[in-house]
Amino acid sequence: MLTKFTDLARKLPSPVYKVAAQAFIDLNFPRHIFIETTAACNLTCEYCPREKRNDHMDFQMFKEIINECSQYGARSFSLHLFGEPLLYPKIMEAISYIKAKNKRHTILLTTNGTVLNKFARRLLESRVDRIIWSWRRLPTEFSSETMEVLKRIGMVRILIEETPKEEFERWSKFPRVEVKHLHNYGGQIDTTKWGLESSNGDRYPCYHLWLAPAIRWNGDVTICCNDPKGSERVGSYGKDGFSIGTYWTGNHLARLRTSHMNNEVKGLCVGCNSYKAYPDIFFNFQKKDGHK
């Protein structure tokens, strides 16, 4: 779903883009769900605000999340937040479970690529829909199977703060190469040292509140994928009747959406610049009406 969203932003003029983007919104249940299968990571990037822990999501909880989502038809899933998803001991079982529940579900994996050689053949056979390899500086050696993965279902994401421009050319043979700036993860890291803007200036509503909540490894549900410390936790999955559905249709999220429409953001959103990842999806008249 999010890759389609990116395509819309790149290809369509603004009014058409807004209409098309809003067609992705489902006020009954989110179209896309971020699931942190693991908090573990084998890198220590200086800019990363992740908590340094190696916990994994309980697989029974994972299945319960997928079961709930599957009641609402085809959905898309990112199986990561701040950990490396290929370090999740049950990552292949997780992928298989999603596809078994609904073959039209789509799966996105964002990986640092360090263990991709080990999983390349199984990922090709698993029906993963998209793999994003996100790197600050790309390695020079790959196995033939890894190259096949990247060519068939991969997207290479290069953070231009760290990758020399001369390296971009050699990635032109892949289906998609995305060059993007590092964002500040809810104001948790200082991106101004790379000459990037903070969240200052005219804001517009963040798409995450209408499209994609996040579930941390321990079941904590937070408003989006840019909350490394879980500071915007809204509930714990499966406890006291709390679910993705109850959050998505509840008063808390309705108030958050209204505050964004009124340009009155609070909490983690105040210093965040990730809303700039996509153009504004709403028309001015909707904001004046306090669209929810």
Where are these regions (language model features)?
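A broadly conserved sequence feature marking short terminus-proximal activation segments
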Residues: 1-17, 226-241
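C-terminal accessory region of radical SAM enzymes
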Residues: 152-197, 226-277
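Short cysteine clusters
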Residues: 41, 45-48, 206, 224-225, ...
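Processing junctions and N-termini across compartments
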Residues: 35, 39-42, 200, 263-266
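Short, acidic, Ser/Thr-enriched surface-loop or helix-capping motifs
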Residues: 215-218
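Conserved alpha-helical substructure of the radical SAM core
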Residues: 2-131, 279-292
